[in-house]
């Protein structure tokens, strides 16, 4: 028995509506409900002095060939700019290091919702790569909601310089998206 339910994905809300005729509200992922100042409290500044590009392919174990293609592209971009490569797809990183590595990256190449989120929060140059594998909806929807869906790349991209993103406009749009989510969550937590 629940008093309130919300979802983080519009496509799931649409599926539930199709089965039940009940429209469930879609709220932002909790990582987006706070701004960079909140995330800065857990930052590991040891990453600040390094110059590197980040790769994070969340589905590595299911698609090693895709990871290999992405890593090759990242290595080409790194060589072009004289950067090191940090591959978050391999190894175990704490939440602090994951967030910190993205915060201080010169550029992020990812197929991950959360790497996209933190790139946006910290205004990092970004290549979000759409694989058309059914796992792209969350970050594709987010980028479209922030009016930057045009930065999405397909796996065959060969750019060496990330697309320009007007992060002031992005953060303004994110603030507008954040308000109804926080209002809904606050209303759910009020005592009856």
Place the predicted regions along the sequence by residue.
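Active-site anion-handling motifs in enzyme catalytic cores
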Residues: 1-192
């Amino acid at each position: 028995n629940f008093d309130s339910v919300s979802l983080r994905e519009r496509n799931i809300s649409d599926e539930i509506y199709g089965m039940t005729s009940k429209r469930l509200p879609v709220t932002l992922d909790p990582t987006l409900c706070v701004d960079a100042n909140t995330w800065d409290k857990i930052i590991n500044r040891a990453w600040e002095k390094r110059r590197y590009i980040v790769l994070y392919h969340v589905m590595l174990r299911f698609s090693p060939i895709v990871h290999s293609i992405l890593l090759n592209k990242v290595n080409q971009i790194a060589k072009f700019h004289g950067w090191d490569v940090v591959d978050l797809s391999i190894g175990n990183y704490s939440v602090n290091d994951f967030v910190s590595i993205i915060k201080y990256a010169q550029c992020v190449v990812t197929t991950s919702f959360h790497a996209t989120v933190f790139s946006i929060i910290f205004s990092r140059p970004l290549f979000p790569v759409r694989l058309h594998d059914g796992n792209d909806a969350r970050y594709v929807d987010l980028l479209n909601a922030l009016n930057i869906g045009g930065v999405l790349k397909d796996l065959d991209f060969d750019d060496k310089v990330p697309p320009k993103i007007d992060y002031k406009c992005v953060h303004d749009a994110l603030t507008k998206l954040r308000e109804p989510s926080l209002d809904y969550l606050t209303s759910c937590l009020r005592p009856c």
